[in-house]
Amino acid sequence: MKSYRKELVFNVPVRRAFINITGQLEDALEESGVKEGLLLCNAMHITASVFINDNESGLHQDYDRWLEKLAPHEPVSAYLHNRTGEDNGDAHLKRQIMGREVVIAITKGRLDFGPWEQVFYGEFDGRRPKRVLVKIIGE
């Protein structure tokens, strides 16, 4: 069985963003040489997310508005976590809602997606470098 590991690095210049990383995962799969197996992709930071959904800008705006209603950034004093001197209590909650990782089947050397599925990196406390792990195992 083959095993392949790669890190992607994102330095998002704004607080919140969704970035389509499907192409980068397809590149990693090609580099790995794996034809049948699994690809795990996870955010390595507790204020970022990796998730699967449709690449439609209205949906991304809906996510952003919905998450901001569930866990608004302001007032920062509303979060006990922020008593530590941080101002990102909301980002931790947003990450928890959107999830940490995805696992995608690899079939015949391709990511085995449904019709509209693509993979996204969700940033909820940007403005500094963050890593995403790609781990591929298989034959």
Question: What are these model-derived regions, one by one?
Answer:
Residues 1-139:
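Active-site histidine-anchored catalytic micro-motif
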